């Protein structure tokens, strides 16, 4: 059965307060200040969406599955939490595949990626090779919808247009342009992401020393934070993200960043002079005067050695997608650093997930 997605907007404030209370309780043992709270739009905040396709009543529908029931599809006609652009594209794409066997044959998954700047890309995933009939239909679809189209089939990828979207975000009075590649991680809530960037920009402040950044991704935070310091050494392990970050640095004429493809654990070994790394050839780590470190780790948080590494710095600016691992990392650092600023970002409304940020300063 086709199901309309519903939610009670009036309950948003209560849900938001529950998250703030949870963060406050987790950080209470560390005498954290009251968190600044950055809310989200109630609808149309999510810039990307992924749907399986499900056949019912002789046609394919967008479908999702509950965490509690992976077998029973929830058929989707509209998706209010997704961006307006995604909601505009959903029926247009559905009409296109219904009218074209070349587009619909063995199509099993659709992914949308959009930006606040209005760019859009659609990825179509198939259980078959893509032939010239598909290319003809997909080229027309891309032109009709003014989007880029990615066709994926058994490890192969066909690109019509670009394999990335362009986002523009305003931070500290400047507009930064970001290339966001298909398949790479990007923050899903663009409005809240912009709030996070501005909070981090203000928390770091203007400094005359250098910044170490771990887990830099496509340069989401790197670009604005680089304007606050003398030099940045940034690390990222994903090759796709590294390439996007390099393009973004060039596009925005940010020339004081050195980017190396190392994991946080490997950089820890390099700084501790445990062993040399060929990927650091020509980079003099001793030339940096690090005063601050910025970390935005995965849900598991920082491993103990990386956490210990951050203790060396006067300031630790930490963005977290998991408040429990954030609290565990702070517990390791609490004897030398105290929380001077704290924030909660409602990146994921209508879920229990949240982003949080802290600035830790050496005692």
From Swiss-Prot:
Gene Ontology molecular function terms on file: rRNA binding; tRNA (uracil(54)-C5)-methyltransferase activity, S-adenosyl methionine-dependent; tRNA binding
Recorded GO CC terms: cytosol
GO biological process terms held by the UniProt record: tRNA methylation
Protein name: tRNA/tmRNA (uracil-C(5))-methyltransferase
Enzyme active site: 321, 355
HAMAP family, alphabetized: RNA_methyltr_TrmA (MF_01011)
Glycoprotein recorded as keyword: no
EC number in record: 2.1.1.-, 2.1.1.35
Function text: Dual-specificity methyltransferase that catalyzes the formation of 5-methyluridine at position 54 (m5U54) in all tRNAs, and that of position 341 (m5U341) in tmRNA (transfer-mRNA).
Keyword Transmembrane among UniProt keywords: no
This protein's UniProt keywords: Methyltransferase, S-adenosyl-L-methionine, Transferase, tRNA processing
SUPFAM superfamilies documented for this protein: S-adenosyl-L-methionine-dependent methyltransferases
PANTHER family: TRNA/TMRNA (URACIL-C(5))-METHYLTRANSFERASE, TRNA_TMRNA (URACIL-C(5))-METHYLTRANSFERASE
Catalytic activity annotation: uridine(54) in tRNA + S-adenosyl-L-methionine = 5-methyluridine(54) in tRNA + S-adenosyl-L-homocysteine + H(+); uridine(341) in tmRNA + S-adenosyl-L-methionine = 5-methyluridine(341) in tmRNA + S-adenosyl-L-homocysteine + H(+)
Similarity annotation: Belongs to the class I-like SAM-binding methyltransferase superfamily. RNA M5U methyltransferase family. TrmA subfamily.
Classification of source organism: Bacteria, Pseudomonadati, Pseudomonadota, Gammaproteobacteria, Pseudomonadales
Residues involved in S-adenosyl-L-methionine binding: 187, 215, 220, 236, 296
């Amino acid at each position: 059965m086709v199901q309309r997605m519903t939610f009670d907007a009036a309950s948003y404030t209560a849900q938001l307060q529950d998250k703030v209370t949870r963060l406050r309780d987790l950080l209470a043992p560390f005498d954290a200040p009251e968190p600044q709270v950055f809310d989200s739009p109630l609808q149309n905040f999510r810039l990307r969406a992924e749907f399986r396709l499900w056949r019912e009543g002789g046609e394919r529908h967008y479908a999702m599955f509950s965490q509690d029931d992976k077998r029973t599809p929830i058929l989707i006609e509209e998706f209010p939490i997704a961006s307006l652009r995604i909601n505009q594209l959903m029926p247009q794409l559905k009409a296109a595949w219904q009218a074209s066997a070349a587009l619909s044959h063995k199509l099993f998954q659709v992914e949308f990626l959009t930006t606040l700047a209005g760019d859009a890309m659609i990825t179509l995933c198939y259980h078959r090779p893509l032939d010239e009939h598909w290319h003809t239909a997909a080229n027309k679809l891309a032109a009709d919808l003014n989007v880029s189209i990615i066709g994926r089939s058994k490890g192969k990828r066909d690109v019509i247009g670009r394999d990335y979207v362009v986002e523009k975000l305003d931070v500290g009075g400047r507009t930064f342009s970001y290339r966001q590649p298909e398949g790479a991680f990007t923050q899903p809530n663009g409005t809240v992401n912009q709030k996070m960037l501005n909070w981090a920009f203000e928390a770091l402040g203007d400094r005359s020393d250098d910044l170490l950044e771990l887990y830099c991704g496509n340069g989401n935070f790197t670009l604005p934070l680089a304007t606050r310091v003398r030099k940045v050494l940034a690390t990222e392990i994903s090759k796709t993200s590294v390439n996007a970050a390099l393009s973004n640095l060039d596009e925005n004429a940010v020339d004081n960043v050195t980017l190396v493809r190392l994991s946080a654990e490997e950089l820890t070994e390099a700084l501790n002079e445990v062993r040399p790394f060929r990927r650091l050839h020509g980079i003099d780590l001793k030339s940096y005067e690090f005063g601050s470190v910025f970390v935005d780790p995965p849900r598991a948080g920082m491993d103990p050695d990386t956490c210990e590494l951050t203790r060396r710095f006067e300031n630790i600016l930490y963005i977290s997608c998991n408040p429990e691992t954030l609290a565990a990392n702070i517990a390791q650092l609490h004897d030398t650093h105290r929380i001077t600023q704290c924030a909660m970002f409602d990146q994921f409304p209508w879920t229990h997930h949240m982003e949080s940020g802290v600035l830790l300063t050496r005692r």
